[in-house]
């Protein structure tokens, strides 16, 4: 199993759709990948929460992953979101993603069925045994209604050497702290919340899987790049400059605000698939104003 570099800013890619939402806009996806790499991100994560994975068909998911891999051309690693409420489906999706060229997979904790900690452990170990590739765990209890504990994560890591990282979107810096204490030398910890990236890196996380970097890859990756280079003051300044936008991209369900921002920049349609709906006018105006303030600050510096 090859090593997977996991530090810096990884973009949780949106999936561009045609204006009617009926098909994936692959031209816009190609352009998005190119913009991310030009902006200095460390890697790409298609078909996660931000990629609207629940409303993609299996064929679309595989096609999106393959297209991202092709567009990246080996310049950055591609880690595909393959998690599901079903262990069997997670294994099947992970194998398909690897066959499409992904360097690793990210598996969200099973949602809806509300498994116990033992269930989360057995699910993850079953996937790890069946998928001999780097695996990133994804804990986002606000969406899955199950919270992978630090103790369970430690038990998983003891039994599954190919579990190499965790995207922690618990919103709990104390959880990050406990993960670092237990597993800091064994497991790479990545923030799953742009607004907490700097705090989590101060505790020992190595980067972020970011939503905001879809819109501003250069500015978002500057936070992690500066921190990892030892420039705490520069990282803090870059982080604080983005804080307003981080918040605005979640005032409505993700990824509708991010797609609204990208549409305003002319990069894709704002279309999302039901049951999501496009961001409202008030949100679009707030995002536009925040972007203008960021641009003015950049020009003044």
From Swiss-Prot:
It is found in: Cytoplasm. One of its GO terms (molecular function) is 4-hydroxy-tetrahydrodipicolinate synthase activity. Pyruvate binds at residues 50, 209. CDD domains: DHDPS. SUPFAM superfamilies: Aldolase. It comes from the Bacteria. Its EC number is 4.3.3.7. Pathway: Amino-acid biosynthesis; L-lysine biosynthesis via DAP pathway; (S)-tetrahydrodipicolinate from L-aspartate: step 3/4. One of its GO terms (biological process) is lysine biosynthetic process via diaminopimelate. Keywords: Amino-acid biosynthesis, Cytoplasm, Diaminopimelate biosynthesis, Lyase, Lysine biosynthesis, Schiff base. GO terms for cellular component: cytosol. The record marks 49, 112 as: Part of a proton relay during catalysis. It catalyses: L-aspartate 4-semialdehyde + pyruvate = (2S,4S)-4-hydroxy-2,3,4,5-tetrahydrodipicolinate + H2O + H(+). Homotetramer; dimer of dimers. Belongs to the DapA family. This is 4-hydroxy-tetrahydrodipicolinate synthase.
């Amino acid at each position: 199993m090859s090593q997977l570099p996991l530090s810096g800013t990884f973009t949780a890619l949106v999936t561009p759709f045609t204006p009617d939402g009926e098909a994936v806009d692959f031209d816009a996806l190609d352009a998005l990948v190119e913009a991310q790499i030009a902006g200095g991100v460390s890697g790409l994560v298609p078909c996660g929460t931000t990629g609207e994975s629940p409303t993609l068909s299996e064929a679309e998911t595989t096609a999106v992953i393959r297209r991202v891999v092709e567009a990246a051309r080996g310049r950055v690693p591609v880690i595909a979101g393959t998690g599901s409420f079903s262990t069997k489906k997670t294994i099947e999706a992970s194998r398909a993603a690897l066959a499409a060229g992904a360097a690793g997979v990210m598996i969200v904790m099973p949602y809806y069925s509300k498994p116990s900690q033992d269930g989360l452990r057995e699910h993850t170990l079953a996937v790890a045994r069946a998928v001999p590739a780097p695996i990133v765990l994804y804990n986002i209890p606000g969406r899955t209604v199950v919270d992978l504990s630090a103790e369970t994560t430690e038990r998983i890591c003891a039994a599954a050497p190919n579990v190499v990282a965790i995207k922690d979107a618990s919103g709990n810096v104390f959880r990050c702290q406990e993960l670092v204490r237990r597993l800091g030398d064994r497991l790479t910890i990545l923030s799953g919340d742009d607004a907490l990236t700097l705090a989590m890196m101060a505790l020992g996380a190595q980067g972020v899987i970011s939503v905001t970097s879809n819109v501003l890859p250069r500015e978002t990756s500057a936070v992690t790049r500066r921190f990892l280079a030892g420039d705490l003051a520069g990282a803090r300044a870059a982080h604080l400059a983005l804080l307003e936008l981080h918040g605005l991209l979640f005032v409505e369900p993700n990824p509708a605000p991010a797609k609204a921002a990208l549409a305003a920049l002319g990069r894709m349609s704002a279309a999302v698939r039901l049951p999501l709906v496009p961001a409202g006018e008030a949100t679009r105006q707030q995002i536009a104003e925040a972007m203008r303030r960021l641009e003015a600050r950049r020009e003044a510096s």
